[in-house]
Amino acid sequence: YVISAIPPTLTSKIHFRPELPSERNQLIQRLPMGAIIKCMMYYKEA
């Protein structure tokens, strides 16, 4: 598991294995910086 604390637009600089869905990458490319709402999520189990 990974917790990423970088702006979503910078995830295009990271090589993921397995690759992220193309729909997600397209959405991230279209979002301007600062248009994201931050939230915190807690899980009892991973």
UniProtKB/Swiss-Prot annotation:
Pfam families tied to this protein: Amino_oxidase
Cofactors: FAD
Location relative to the cell: Mitochondrion outer membrane
Recorded GO CC terms: mitochondrial outer membrane
InterPro entries: Amino_oxidase, FAD/NAD-bd_sf, Flavin_MAO
EC numbers, comma separated: 1.4.3.21, 1.4.3.4
Keyword check for Methyltransferase: no
Organism: Ovis aries
Residue spans crossing the bilayer: none
Subunit structure: Monomer, homo- or heterodimer (containing two subunits of similar size). Each subunit contains a covalently bound flavin. Enzymatically active as monomer.
GO molecular function: flavin adenine dinucleotide binding; monoamine oxidase activity; primary methylamine oxidase activity
Function: Catalyzes the oxidative deamination of primary and some secondary amine such as neurotransmitters, with concomitant reduction of oxygen to hydrogen peroxide and has important functions in the metabolism of neuroactive and vasoactive amines in the central nervous system and peripheral tissues. Preferentially oxidizes serotonin. Also catalyzes the oxidative deamination of kynuramine to 3-(2-aminophenyl)-3-oxopropanal that can spontaneously condense to 4-hydroxyquinoline.
Lineage of the organism: Eukaryota, Metazoa, Chordata, Craniata, Vertebrata
Topology with respect to the bilayer: Single-pass type IV membrane protein
Name of the featured protein: Amine oxidase [flavin-containing] A
Entry keyword set: Catecholamine metabolism, FAD, Flavoprotein, Membrane, Mitochondrion, Mitochondrion outer membrane, Neurotransmitter degradation, Oxidoreductase, Transmembrane
Catalytic activity: a secondary aliphatic amine + O2 + H2O = a primary amine + an aldehyde + H2O2; a primary methyl amine + O2 + H2O = an aldehyde + H2O2 + NH4(+); (R)-adrenaline + O2 + H2O = (R)-3,4-dihydroxymandelaldehyde + methylamine + H2O2; dopamine + O2 + H2O = 3,4-dihydroxyphenylacetaldehyde + H2O2 + NH4(+)
